[in-house]
Amino acid sequence: MHSLDERFTWGGVELHFDVEKGNISKVQVFTDSLTPDVIEFFANKLVLAPYKEDTITQAIEVTQKQYPAHHDELKQLQDWLVKAIL
């Protein structure tokens, strides 16, 4: 399991990744954000995808389309995760 956590102005996010053969098999999300459904939606888009930068970017783009009001928060999440998994 690979765990990452960060505190943003809009809430804290902790992600636990189970990675098998380079692919994300499971993601657990812990957040005190007022909109946890946005983070959960994003995390669900990562399951069964490769654990790499492109996956994060694609999942963020899909989530931004579903939740356009949270574009800025999702961009912050993307910037953090891309740096954290490199």
Each PLM stretch: what is its role?
Residues 23-86:
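Active-site- and interface-proximal helix/loop "cap" or "latch" segments in soluble metabolic
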Residues 1-19:
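Structured beta-strand/loop patches that form or line metal/cofactor-binding pockets in enzymes
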